[in-house]
Amino acid sequence: MSNSSKKHLDLPYRPGVGMMILNADNHIFVGKRIDTKISAWQMPQGGIVPGETPSIAAMREMLEEIGSDKGYIIAESKFWYSYDVPSFLIPKLWNGNFRGQKQRWFLIRFTGNNEDININTSNPEFDQWRWASLDELLSIIIPFKRKLYQAVVKEFESLIQ
């Protein structure tokens, strides 16, 4: 293991939230990240501001990332899920202060319509978005987040059917 790899493993995880946002057809909102040339699709996620509860952070991040807060929380994950970003990305993300994220996930029912979604927010994270079926979700997600997404799907799957 290289010294830089050991150093990265010593970094903490950034506390955050993730949102599995469902429409009326039980399809899941996914956005294509604006900050990469590769096809990096993901569900909305973001950091927790100090003093903020995870549920408040989830609804704030939903508004910030999809331009709408029309929805309600169906469930909160029982666990904090974590993932490591590839080591070459660490210096480019969060000022190099974190090795990845530790997230509480929320299943959210979107009560608006497609016209309520506006990814052209003040700090856009996505340049495209769409609704994905549960079956296709794991195949389009960026690979280093796939294991986390599998765990989230497993936890929420019975509530989506």
UniProtKB/Swiss-Prot annotation:
GO MF entry, a single one: mRNA 5'-diphosphatase activity
Origin superkingdom: Bacteria
CDD domains per record: NUDIX_Ap4A_hydrolase_plant_like
GO biological process, one term: mRNA catabolic process
Enzyme nomenclature, EC number: 3.6.1.-
UniProt KW keywords: Hydrolase, Metal-binding
TM ranges: none
Domain annotation Nudix hydrolase: ranges: 12-154
Any GO CC annotation of this UniProt entry: cytoplasm
Locus of motif Nudix box: 46-67
Record InterPro entries: NUDIX_hydrolase-like_dom_sf (IPR015797), NUDIX_hydrolase_CS (IPR020084), NUDIX_hydrolase_dom (IPR000086), RppH (IPR022927)
Swiss-Prot/TrEMBL cofactor(s): a divalent metal cation
Enzyme class at the top of the EC tree: hydrolase
A Pfam cross-reference name: NUDIX
Keyword NADP among record annotations: no
Function recorded in the entry: Accelerates the degradation of transcripts by removing pyrophosphate from the 5'-end of triphosphorylated RNA, leading to a more labile monophosphorylated state that can stimulate subsequent ribonuclease cleavage.
HAMAP family recorded: Nudix_RppH (MF_00298)
Cross-referenced NCBIfam families: PRK00714.1-3, PRK00714.1-5
Family named by the database record: Belongs to the Nudix hydrolase family. RppH subfamily.
Entry protein name: RNA pyrophosphohydrolase
Species classification: Bacteria, Pseudomonadati, Pseudomonadota, Alphaproteobacteria, Rickettsiales
